Amino acid sequence: MVRKLISEFVGTMLLVLFGCGTAVAVNTYVFSIYNISLPFTMLIIALAFGLVLTAIASVIGNVSGAHVNPAVSIAMAIDKRMSIIECVEYVIVQILGGIVGAEILGIIFGGYTSLGANGYGALSALGETTTLATAIIVEVLLTFTFVLVVLVVSAKQDKGTNGIVIGLTLALVHMFGIPFTGTSVNPARSIGPAIFTRGDALSQLWVFIVAPIVGAILAALFYKFVIKERETTKFEFKITNRKLKTSDKVITAVPAVKEAAEVKPAKKVVKKAPAKKEVVKKETTKKAPAKKVVAKTKTTKKDK
């Protein structure tokens, strides 16, 4: 468990360091100095978050699952892929990792005025047109989408492309959400920068904690009751300790084969050979004495 917690701490720290660091670098230097358009800066920031998550998943995916996001860990706990205690431990180290990552950014850029903190209204790229309601709706929907993809992809047996799919999904939601809120979908990514930036970023932080959690819960429930393939209650059996993922025709055929296989041993239990031996013994014991008695009676009559 210690290895998992350390992996989550380091992974979240790197996510904030490279993701938010790219946002700060682009907005502070590239966008202002070279007058690059907003869509291009959005693309750079989105790809930065997606690529760093892909790299993190490739490195620590086999160790901790590479959640690096409290919303993902909460969804995993709801789906019973981890215990509540494990989920709490994951969330704590993820938040700490995000704080350390933001602290490193402040040291690198020589200040804490801009660390890629999330926000709406005056803090967003669209300005005052982004209201509180808009920010909540955007964050809930984006987190729902991202966490749902994580749940579906991580449940598959072939995990070779998981990191790429999840990373591209994170880049996609960033492309959509950056103008509205800067895109959080991850409370640990928002907490660290907001703590050091303070001001409106800190006062608006609750939105980027509550909305992603709500989106994660909705995604977990949708996955559980709509997408997830469950074992049928009619036929309770296991095939190589895996859940059935076949069509209804195969499911009905498999029990029939198993029932036939179970009937054959029942027929073999009836032993016919011992029964024949018992009959032979009874016949020999009855006939032998009868012959001897007849022979004796005949000899006695002749003597007389």
Name the predicted role of every residue range.
Residues 1-287, 291-304:
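Membrane-interface helix-loop junctions and terminal tails of multi-pass membrane proteins
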